[in-house]
C-alpha cells in the first residue's frame, strides 16, 4: 500500500515502507522515471546499500562506471561507496522498486529535494548538494580523462 507520493522534478516517488514501519531495517519505494527525465547526479551512499528491482520499462544504471540495464524482474545492487546514477534512455516510462538497507533514507529527503527542484528555474546546485550530504548521499563528479 502506498503511504505517500512525492513528485521530485520529473520523477515520481511512491513510498511503501519507511524506518518507522520496519524498526529501521529497510525503506522501500517505487519510482517512476519518464522518458528523457532529468535524474539525480551521480552520487554514493555513505551508510546504506540500495537494491533496485525493475517493474516496467528499462532503466540504465551506471554503478562504478559499469552500465547495467534493469528491466522488469531484473535487479541491481548498489553497495555503500559505489558511485552510481541512472537514466531512462528508452522510449517508454520506466518504473522500479528501491530497497534501502538500513532505512536511513526516507520521505523527508525526497521532500527537501523536491522543494529545490520544483521551485522553478534552474535548481540551486549548492542547496541540492547540501541536502544530499545531510542524508548521506555524496555527490560525485565524473572523473575527466586526460586529453
Feature locations, PLM:
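Structural motif
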Residues: 12, 51, 58-60, 67, ...
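Short acidic-glycine-tyrosine-enriched beta hairpin
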Residues: 65-83
Amino acid at each position: 500500500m502506498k503511504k505517500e507520493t512525492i513528485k521530485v522534478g520529473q520523477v515520481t516517488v511512491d513510498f511503501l515502507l519507511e524506518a518507522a514501519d520496519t524498526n529501521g531495517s529497510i525503506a522501500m519505494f517505487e519510482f517512476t522515471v519518464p522518458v528523457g527525465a532529468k535524474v539525480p547526479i551521480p552520487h554514493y551512499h555513505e551508510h546504506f546499500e540500495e537494491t533496485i528491482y525493475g517493474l516496467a520499462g528499462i532503466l540504465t544504471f551506471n554503478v562504478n562506471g559499469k552500465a547495467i540495464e534493469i528491466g522488469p524482474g531484473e535487479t541491481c545492487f548498489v553497495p555503500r561507496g559505489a558511485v552510481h546514477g541512472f537514466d531512462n534512455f528508452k522510449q517508454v516510462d520506466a518504473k522500479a522498486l528501491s530497497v534501502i538497507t538500513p532505512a536511513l533514507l526516507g520521505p523527508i529527503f525526497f521532500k527537501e529535494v523536491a522543494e529545490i527542484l520544483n521551485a522553478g528555474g534552474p535548481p540551486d546546485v549548492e542547496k541540492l548538494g547540501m541536502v544530499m550530504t545531510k542524508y548521506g548521499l555524496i555527490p560525485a563528479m565524473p572523473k575527466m580523462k586526460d586529453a
